[in-house]
Amino acid sequence: MSGNTDMPKSDTPPVVFIVDDDPDIRSSLSRALRLRGHTVESFENADAFLERYDSSMFGCLILDQGLPGMTGLELQRHMNNQGIPLPIIFITGHGGVPESVQAIKGGAIDFLEKPFRQTELIERINAALEAAKTQRKSESRKKDARARFERLTPREREIVDHMLRNPSEASSKGIARALDISPRTVDHHRARILEKLLVNSVAELIDLALRLDEAPTTDV
């Protein structure tokens, strides 16, 4: 049994998505990013981006606010409604304070006005990609934890719930009293629980549960 609960690293590289109707900006920015080793995909409008994007992709989005058709802010709202988690950096040639405030409230990590220094934008992109990698790792760890808990039987889950809600009564005798079963039966279930969850101790079990916010708040 292994106590190592880290997920394996994904080989999928992050993607910098660029959505801007200006072909010169798309071309120059794509070239600069590729020279720095980034994977880049660019689109002239929001519909083309949405047609290409799927949930297996991660990275960040460089988004022009003044797009024809669906605007940048409208695309941001659509992404939020659909649960698309890409960090967004807005770029605009005619944005004002209301637009920038709306974008930031919607979850954008930055709002730059054209003309911008390319080096400044690339710095923001690098920060956004680091945030995306951290988020992806967190989601992978949560998915892994959820899959482990789904292996438990209803009785095993009942025992785990008791252990999380009542850590001071997490001994075999304490659980046996609470659930009206024998300590020997509890010992058998505990061994199976640790095996299924791939943990070596109750402390590791609690750490795994916290990834899913599974640990209930005890009453004071």
Regions found by a protein language model. Give the residues of each.
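Basic, Lys/Arg-enriched C-terminal extension of HTH/homeodomain DNA-binding domains
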Residues: A191-V220
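Active-site beta3 strand of CheY-like receiver
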Residues: S56-L63, L67
